[in-house]
């Protein structure tokens, strides 16, 4: 039965009419630049981020994601810049996204800034069909592997934020790119992997429950054609601006426990464990995600305390 499930997962990632989605993160709130270019430079300091995520541990061919990024404001200007790399491995596919982000911010009120962002992405897709067990060995459509198939893309984002509140709307990939069409030139719409538009909305607010305790509920919704609407709800508490603990729920998919520690003024480490709430939980032992963030507090408007997002 487990092999059947594995085959089903691999089919979802490779066969006809697959609506491709962006890599999934539970701790997205610490690296929002991956989904919204307007986030670049919004923390007021250079921020370096790394992530490793192993999804559905124990299930062959399950997603493994590695990500790294750096973003910073440019001196006293309203400009922010960022660069990010995401590697996503699922079954026979190995995909790399290299992105450059640009943001421009305007002061809309005494408390709020509105940032506009642009993203340019280079996608490199590799698919090794020899890792699949073919139902029809004579199907020559899968005879040749895909090697570093290049696809460019662009994205946009808006980010309204203050010291304790944020809202964001973004589409990191606007171009609906067909990475590989096995019937190219015949007029068929059958394809192996198609990049559909992913639309994101995020929101969050930090409540000061006491001098040493902060509470932050947050929301992420993601829409992509051909896939169910994704809704992520999370609630995190920060103690003494050092320790973070919280819970998250991905609608009809999983529940998560999140912990974090601000080791120094610059270093933050976070961990999340996801447990499936679907029948898939019978075939894996959960998902693990660890993040590491390093920040240089050498900006013109140095933050008095670590920001919660």
Predicted region positions:
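Subset of outer-membrane beta-barrel
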Residues: 20-309
């Amino acid at each position: 039965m487990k092999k059947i499930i594995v085959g089903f997962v691999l089919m979802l990632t490779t066969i006809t009419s697959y609506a491709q989605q962006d890599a999934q993160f539970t701790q997205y709130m610490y690296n929002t630049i991956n989904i919204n270019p307007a986030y670049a430079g919004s923390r007021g300091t250079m921020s370096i981020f790394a992530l490793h995520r192993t999804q559905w541990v124990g299930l062959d061919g399950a997603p493994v994601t590695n990500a790294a990024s750096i973003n910073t404001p440019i001196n006293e200007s309203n400009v922010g810049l960022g660069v990010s790399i995401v590697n996503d491995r699922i079954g026979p596919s190995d995909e790399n996204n290299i992105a450059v982000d640009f943001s421009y911010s305007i002061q809309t009120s005494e408390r709020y800034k509105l940032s506009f962002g642009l993203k340019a992405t280079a996608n490199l897709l590799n698919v090794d069909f020899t890792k699949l067990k073919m139902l029809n060995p004579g199907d020559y459509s899968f005879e040749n592997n895909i090697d570093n198939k290049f696809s460019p893309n662009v994205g946009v984002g808006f980010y309204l934020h203050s010291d304790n509140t944020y809202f964001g709307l973004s589409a990191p990939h606007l171009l609906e790119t067909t990475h590989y069409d096995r019937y190219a030139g015949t007029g068929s719409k059958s394809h192996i992997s198609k990049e559909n538009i992913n639309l994101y909305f995020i929101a969050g607010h930090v409540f000061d429950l006491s001098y040493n305790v902060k509470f932050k509920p947050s929301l992420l919704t993601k829409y992509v054609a051909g896939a169910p609407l994704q809704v992520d709800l999370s609630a995190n508490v920060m103690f003494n601006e050092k320790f973070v603990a919280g819970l998250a729920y991905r609608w009809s998919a999983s529940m998560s426990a999140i912990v974090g520690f601000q080791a120094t003024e610059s270093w933050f480490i976070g961990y999340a464990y996801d447990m499936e709430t679907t029948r898939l939980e019978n075939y894996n032992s959960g998902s693990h995600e660890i993040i590491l963030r390093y920040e240089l507090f050498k900006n013109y408007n140095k933050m008095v305390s670590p920001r919660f997002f």
